[in-house]
A protein has these predicted regions:
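Non-catalytic, conserved peripheral segments adjacent to functional cores
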Residues: 1-54, 74-78, 83-137
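Conserved SET/PR-domain catalytic core that frames the SAM/AdoMet-binding pocket
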Residues: 54-73
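Glycine/Thr-rich phosphate-binding loops of Rossmann-like dinucleotide-binding domains
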Residues: 70, 149, 200-201
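SDR active-site strand-loop-helix element
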Residues: 142, 167, 191-195
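Adenosine-cofactor binding site in Rossmann-like domains, unifying the SAM/SAH pocket
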Residues: 163-182
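NAD(P)H-binding glycine-rich loop region in Rossmannoid oxidoreductase-like domains
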Residues: 178-210
């Protein structure tokens, strides 16, 4: 969907660690990097680290929720990353971060971080113990004020499930094509439609019992 290029004039430029709500395909146009990736998705693999060097002969796929970082090892390194979602302010709210210098991660940077070039923002990212896991994609429930919608909401609240949003016709009429643009659909992984025209009481009438 969107291809980005980061040109690094001097070796030692170090960026990260950023987990974003999209997949990335990373390649190097010129130069070489040391890459470090940290799993920031909730679960048993949270905090696991993978490192490798990339040059123009190699590329790597980074799934959604895995923190990405790199260090330029040559002057004039061009780092490219193809992503499968467009940037948006709503997407940015879901980013999560961890500090490049976290001793728990113990990333073996080829150029010591104190000799590297880092941004002010990257210097102040939290350590892993304070990092917020990347939330999974959201689930939207439409028709939430009907019988089925209420049952779904009760189940979600009883079981403490996270990431659910509830809409009824007054906030999202899915029969109206003009209303779809109010949502960034890349943030959602599941849609549950609990809305329909029903007349349950007619089942108790002669008309409802042919």
């Amino acid at each position: 969907v969107q291809n980005n290029i980061s040109f690094n004039a001097k070796k030692g430029v170090t960026r990260g660690i950023h987990a974003e709500p999209w997949d990335k395909y990373i390649s190097i146009a010129t130069g070489e990097i040391f890459g470090a990736w940290v799993d920031l998705r909730p679960g048993e693999s949270f905090g696991q680290v993978y490192t490798t060097r990339l040059d123009p002969s190699k590329a790597i796929y980074v799934p959604r929720g895995v923190g990405n970082s790199f260090q330029a090892l040559e002057d004039g390194t061009a780092y490219t990353y193809l992503v499968n979602a467009h940037w948006s302010l709503e997407q940015k709210k879901t980013y999560t971060f961890v500090n490049l210098a976290d001793p728990e991660l113990n990333i073996p940077w080829p150029i010591p971080l104190e000799e590297s070039e880092r941004s002010e923002a990257d210097l102040h990212h939290p350590m892993l113990k304070d990092a917020k896991p990347m939330a999974p994609r959201r689930t939207m429930v439409t028709g939430c004020n009907g019988q089925l919608g209420h049952a779904i909401r009760d189940y979600v609240e009883t079981h403490g499930l996270q990431g659910f949003e509830f809409n009824d016709i007054d906030t999202f009429d899915f029969s109206d094509p003009t209303q779809y643009d109010q949502f960034d659909w890349s943030l959602y992984g599941t849609i549950i439609n609990a809305g329909a025209y029903t007349a349950v009481d007619k089942a108790e009438t002669d008309e409802g019992r042919p």
